[in-house]
Amino acid sequence: MSIDLNLTEEIVARVGRKPEALIPILQGLQERYGYLPEDALRRVCERTEIAPASVTGVASFYDMFRLKPVGKHIVRVCTGTACHVAGAERVEAALRRHLNIPSGADTDRDGEFTVEQVACLGCCTLAPVVKIGEMTFGHTTPERVPEMVREYLASQNGKKMVKSTEELSISRAGGAEIHVGLGSCCMAKGSDKLFHALAESASACGGSVTVKRVGCVGMCHRTPMIEVAQADKGSTLYADLTPAHARALVQKHFRPRGFVQHASRLWSRVLDGLLLDDSGEQRGVQRFAMSKRDPGVRAFLDKQVHIATEHFGKLDPLSLDEYVANGGFEALRKCLANAESGKRSADQDAVINSIEKSGVRGRGGAGFPTGQKWRVVAQQPGETKFVICNGDEGDPGAFMDRMILESFPFRVIEGLAIAAVAVGAHEGVFYIRHEYPLAVKRVRAAIEQMEKHGWLGTKLMGTHYPLKLSVFEGAGAFVCGEETALIASIEGKRGMPKLRPPFPAQEGLWGKPTLINNVETLALVPWIMRNGAEKFAAIGTTKSKGTKVFALAGKIKRGGLIEVPMGTTIREIVEEIGGGVADGRRFKAVQIGGPSGGCVPARLADTSVDYESLRDLGAIMGSGGLVVLDDTSCMVDIARYFLQFTQDQSCGKCTFCRIGTKRMLEILERLCAGKASRQHLEELERLAVQVGAGSLCGLGKTAPNPVLTTLRYFRDEYEAHLAGRCPAKKCAALIKYSINADCTGCTICSQHCPVDAIPMTPYSRHLIDDVKCTRCDTCRVVCPNQAVEVK
Amino acid sequence: MNYAFSITIDGRAVEVQPGESVLAASRKLGLDIPTLCYLEKCGPLNSCQVCLVKINGKLVPSCGTKAAAGMMVESETTEVHEARRTALELLFSDHVGDCLSPCQRLCPLMLNIPVMLRHIQAGRLPEASATIRQALPLAGVLGRLCHHPCEQGCRRGQWDDPAAIREMEKVITDWERSSGYSPSGKAEGGKRKAETGPSILTPAAEAKTVAIIGAGPTGLAAAYYLTREGHAVTVVDRRAHAGGSLRDVPSAQLPAEVLDAEIAVLGRMGVEFKLGAELGNPLTLDGLGRGFDAILLAVGELAKDEAAELALPMVGAALRTDPNTCQTPLEKVFAAGSCVRVQKQIIKAMAEGRAAAECVNRFLRGQAARRPEKPFSSIMGRLDPAELKAFIRNSKSGGSVSPCDRCAGHTKQEAAAESARCLHCDCHSSGNCVLQHYAQVYGADANRFRSERRKFERQVQPGGIIFEPGKCILCGICVKLCEMAAEPLGLAFVGRGFDVRVAAPFDDTIERGLQKVADECVAQCPTGALVFVENGEH
């Protein structure tokens, strides 16, 4: 197959010829060709300073790069924690069956569809999530698969491109506003379509109302969600809306101008009044309305304190004016008052003093004191220093950083700029994972706006301080969240961690002192500088100050993005904010801190959420993924899931992580298959400790945590697996499906069974062929009489 | 800080220069911290993690950790050793290949059979002789009478016939006699003659005297090994000729001249024979004890009354010895062979003689007596059909080569053809492999983590490099050397995590990747992943 090498030439010409151009070049090639053709790669070697060994090494390291052509349509199945506990494996199996993908392959024989797993799409509250092409589907089930594929193909055939919500010219009509949350998970639930429908209805109605894009609203469990804000009437929230409701909603709130519209409004209100919902209780769009005084909404919001997410649901993410109008860049201006390039001023030290005094610690996981980190970088000799915003939020089950970048790009830019000024850096990089395209887009757009404004580049905020900011898109490697691996990645290398010391603060990017802070940490900085360190330090516990943003997901009623003061208990988060687990289920544990964290059992739920308390339990604060588990979650399976993840994401450099996690995973797989012996369990425990002690970087050192904590708190479940039982009835090899006497012979299970394991026997009790049964759970879900039992 | 400072390793202070690593400091103290991925020129690569030490409660690689003033390092502790051993065991769990070929592992005397066969194949008979003599006492006898367990393990046998290993020993020893080649290393007239083979003597530490009672297979084998260790050995036997039970073998199976020639080899090595002398009056254990530093009883199967005469504790009709040290309750009296446990196979009786020799040798050197350690070997297990086929492709096809003249045995050419059937499934780096070395030192268990292994793969390149990816431990030295030498193609890590492999870019061959630094990469490979083809194979 010959390819057009001119495209390669163009990309090289645009991106550059230095070694560090490698990853962007490969990203460009993949975008153009759909994969990385060898001829193109060889051409890259000829045209640039990049060595063939680097090209092969890097192209085979990162998940996003493909060395073989793929199907026309890419189906990405999210395998994040929340998706895993919600049954992503079953959805993937259904997709593969439906799309006729042979086992062991990822693409069907006609080259139409490629199904691949993706570490985490960061839409955890919509789990399980599947992305087909650019369309994201939330709350998927095996039964919905055919419908999803149909819907996707229909959108492709009709060329009905969903309008982008990114290039909006926002008209400021003044007066009333309708706020539509347009984070990527809201969009996955159709808020972009709703946005367009509302905008259309609003303009039909006449210009008295502005439909405004805002960032994350936090209440992911109720999206798409909008807020109608009217100066005279206060605000009303609507949840779970669809585009079909747009007109009725606009007309309910806003009086149209012309006669025709007026008549139409009256007519639609009559129609709306006739609509009954299933329960017959409320009518029309009114049934979607909720008040902020609603007990559920209050429980969700009352305990929260919004600092990193200040003005959530109110700000247009890309409106510089709005950001400035709400106190944006005040803090940066203050810091810049006397800053000049090349000279340290007392003000710079004052900034670091404030950060130190605030007690803020790194929100990326380890909780290193931020001020101290800044001071080390500031004290390093040399002119050239770098600041990096770590937006490689790789933990499955975490999406705080994505949401902050998507909703408050200017805030993070301000935080990074303050850090740059404080340590004396003139170049900053946003490292954002490519799985977050909207975050990348918005940060780029925000930087561009600031540059146009003359606020970035040679004159930061118009002063004499030069600061250049750029965005580096990650290429899909969890390990790049580790600072030294992240730096290697920016330098165009495989993302392999290095031994520390030397720390990046001493020898970082290009060997220069480099400050790396997490997105959330930087988002806190402007608030601290604006409101004072004391005010920040007044929130939280003795050693853990301020707030923490959590992605609350899993087996919980009100999932979403929350920001709570440090010291809030796990129980308050799960039961009050999240509303607890589903009725009839038992709250069993929370998985906190992702693959490096651990499982805290429900009996320890009164533990305060702060760095030390969580560490004492064997978990870590982590970046803030908080996945709630109930009695249907198998803890051995959870441990296996995380080991699978870390093993898959290990860079492969050091022995303990590369081989040790593999051997641990093998034992866990044996356990889940009911084939493990006591010796295996003992070896698992011994090896877990040794992998933790002997690995080179944080990824390997913390990889055994999910195993160690589940062994510590749920040993009985391991014991049960040794005896061949899975108490949560999750491990496929240890369970059996059968149909009891309640079966009425309705045949629904037989019709839905994807593998024909249930012969159709109308009006008599059905039987499941255990050999054919794949434990996909479909029959149990569809049975109207709860006659399907799992043993 | 540009002045030297000191750090403490296992309680011992050592002075270091600024910038020096903990590893460098430990070497100054003479500590042997194992390293696989460290090469000074490449700087610390920090991949193997076997050089771990404990500092401030944390395990860190010593090669990449710079010494800092006042640092307290733990190196030779149980905990640190356990971590190093685990690292080695993890590496072995993903290390595909045998250090030692199955035939060698099955040989009670550990003859390096594949090397012998490569010499024969290439017509290097003196070298083949040296290889045999290095391991086997009475090689000519074994070439005729050995029950050749080696051939049962030969992988070639999985395909057609095993290599005729015993026959090759016979060919070499017959050649020695017919050509007048003297396999003894002891040169006449004090000077080594050009035509004599390489020395198989190891220099004496301090001359000690040993009396061996019994000139059967066990006693002669012990005499052979003890003489090689530099001890003065006297073999006593009641018969007029040395050989013990070997003298009873029909001459069709073992002609007397063969046995005589083998005993002559021992004589040339310096073994004294005192024949026709029976233990009893006047030769007593007490008397021998006054004249010799150690006594080894290898008198063969004992009758009840004979045993009583020795006045040593018995278990049934056998002498009671410590199974680990071959020692009887009498000081400096050892016993081995059929007088301790009846041995039916000659080579096993000789292996007992070898074990006893090692016990005696250690005793004479003032060390605790113990049997020789089993050499460490990674074990690949049975080959699957595809792997076997790949091996067969790289060797001479066809079943075993029978000699034209059955009585005369294989000619040199026939022997070469038969030897060419060897699959060379041994590791070329065995004995020269850092991984194997430290596995032995640390008592690593190559099978601690049992799991499905990767497929064995051997890429024999036209230019003479053999690459066996399954043996690569991803130390990164070759990748780094290529980078430093700006190889036009070079080698790269390909893939991520457990699946990472070292390969040339764009699926090219290893040899094309190594245009400048092939020699260096082969020399520095810590395992047998990169080796050169040896003369006589492929």
Tell me what each language-model feature is.
Chain B
Residues 2-185, 192, 197-204, 294-334, ...:
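Ferredoxin-type iron-sulfur electron-transfer modules and their immediate structural context
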Residues 29, 229, 269, 288-291, ...:
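Conserved dinucleotide-binding and phosphotransfer motif residues
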Residues 42-43, 242-243, 281-283, 498:
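Short secondary-structure capping/turn micro-motifs that flank functional sites
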Residues 120, 162-166, 212-281, 392-404, ...:
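Beta1-alpha1 glycine-rich phosphate/pyrophosphate-binding loop at the start
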Residues 120, 124-127, 204, 209-211, ...:
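Feature captures the FAD/FMN-dependent oxidoreductase FAD-binding
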Residues 180, 200-207, 243-254:
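Accessory recognition modules or surfaces
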Residues 222, 245, 284-285, 306-308, ...:
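Short glycine-/acidic-enriched loop or helix-start segments at secondary-structure transitions
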